[in-house]
């Protein structure tokens, strides 16, 4: 099936919210999770440097990656916040393409690094990031801060 990759629009918000809940359920192994607070996703549609990238198949959003530009401190970096691919679509290279797009976006903004957090026990995600060249910058309780120089 063909996958279209693009920047999200406000019309994608419901699908992004659903994928976020699916991601939380996978990470925390429970159905009892809360989604984004009201207004959170809308901040990505204001025309600033923060964006959400989406993957779409047959008109449905099947993956997303939210990007936040951080220019305070040195070095400036792109932070990958939330990242989810629908369970039925995993293994198709969607995650790799979204990461590739994030790198392209960081370079276009002149940001030399990418940072993200991952849960220590999310071994699948940790393997994905390791294959993509991320290393551990800091251990922060149940999470690891990972980084990659571009």
Give, region by region, the residue ranges found by the protein language model.
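Acetyl-CoA-dependent GNAT
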Residues: 3, 7-81, 86, 99-101, ...
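Loop/helix-junction capping segments adjacent to catalytic residues or to phosphate/diphosphate-binding pockets
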Residues: 74, 92, 123
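Conserved acetyl-CoA-binding loop-helix of GNAT-fold acetyltransferases
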Residues: 85, 91-104, 127, 131
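Conserved active-site alpha-helix within GNAT-family acetyltransferase domains
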Residues: 96, 120-138, 144-145
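Conserved GNAT acetyl-CoA-binding A-motif
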Residues: 106-117
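Short beta-strand-to-coil "C-cap" segments at the C-terminal boundary of structured domains/repeats
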Residues: 147-150
């Amino acid at each position: 099936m063909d996958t279209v990759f693009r920047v999200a629009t406000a019309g994608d918000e419901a699908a992004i919210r659903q994928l976020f809940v699916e991601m939380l359920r996978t990470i925390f192994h429970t159905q009892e999770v809360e989604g984004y607070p009201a207004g959170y996703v809308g901040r990505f549609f204001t025309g600033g440097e923060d964006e959400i990238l989406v993957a779409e198949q047959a008109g449905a959003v099947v993956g997303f990656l939210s990007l936040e530009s951080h220019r305070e401190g040195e070095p400036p970096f792109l932070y990958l916040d939330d990242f989810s691919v629908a369970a039925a679509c995993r293994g198709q290279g969607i995650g790799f393409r979204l990461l590739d797009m994030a790198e392209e976006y960081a370079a276009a903004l002149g940001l030399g690094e990418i940072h993200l957090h991952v849960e220590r026990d999310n071994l699948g995600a940790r393997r994905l990031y390791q294959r993509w060249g991320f290393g551990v910058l800091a251990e922060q309780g149940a999470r690891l801060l990972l980084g990659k120089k571009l």
